[in-house]
Amino acid sequence: MKTSDFLVIGAGVAGLSFALRAAEHGKVAVITKGKFLDCSSAKAQGGIAAVWDRNDSFEDHIADTLDAGAGLCNEQAVRTIVEEGPGAIRELLEWGVNFDPGNQGEDYELAREGGHTKRRILHAKDATG
């Protein structure tokens, strides 16, 4: 019988992020109902949005998200996710994610995509989502 300190159910980005953190404190097992890459995170397309540019703000990102959500978003949840976004990007960088480098002295290429009024989408080639 296999044993672990932490059992993570799901191999998407949320589950694997937790597994990486939990691994600092004990043995981790990750299980999924299908193939390892047969999860929504692996099938997602596009990039990851975060306030990364000094010309952007949390308030602008929150407003864009609430507007695009057509009244269906929980404002406090949106605020929390947006405000924690830059920290999540820094953590991904520490884990070795190579976001596309920027031009003209920028650290990373930032794109403007649907629903966003500012450039805040980071890509890692075509693998992010």
Q: Which ranges hold each PLM region?
A:
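Core beta-strand elements of the Rossmann-like FAD/NAD(P) dinucleotide-binding domain
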Residues: M1-S4
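N-terminal Rossmann-like FAD-binding beta1-loop-alpha1 element of flavoenzymes
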Residues: F6-V30
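Conserved N-terminal/central alpha/beta ligand/cofactor-binding core
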Residues: T32, F36-G129
